[in-house]
């Protein structure tokens, strides 16, 4: 019997997959626990529509991320802060600081977790990476100057 999995089932398959299961296993285990439903024509049509909608949504998200990456590519962020005699900062510049500066300077809100960088503790010029989507990222420059 062909069934559509409604949830991930260990050693069987993932949500949305169409698998072949024995009649007894499907009727006595999968169906009562709402883990699967029978793969009828109407259920298959609904599943295909859901997959198509998810694919379109993902493509739209990737397109938006690529557009944003194009806008941010090569942009510079200049930070003026107090610096000690040896060039060390009083405090440090973190991804949270960079995210708030991107928001103020370019009016683009980016989650701090999407900014890939080490904590900046010295004055100078740095390259950071902003991962907007798993396959989409861009590089930006950060300049740390004395106040």
Swiss-Prot record:
UniProt keywords, alphabetically: Ribonucleoprotein, Ribosomal protein, RNA-binding, rRNA-binding
InterPro entries, per the entry: Ribosomal_bL9, Ribosomal_bL9/RNase_H1_N, Ribosomal_bL9_bac/chp, Ribosomal_bL9_C, Ribosomal_bL9_C_sf, Ribosomal_bL9_N, Ribosomal_bL9_N_sf
Pfam families linked: Ribosomal_L9_C, Ribosomal_L9_N
Source taxon at top rank: Bacteria
Record GO biological process: translation
GO annotations of cellular component type: ribonucleoprotein complex; ribosome
GO molecular function: rRNA binding; structural constituent of ribosome
PANTHER family named in the record: 50S RIBOSOMAL PROTEIN L9
Its biological purpose: Binds to the 23S rRNA.
Family: Belongs to the bacterial ribosomal protein bL9 family.
Protein name, entry field: Large ribosomal subunit protein bL9
Gene assigned in the entry: rplI
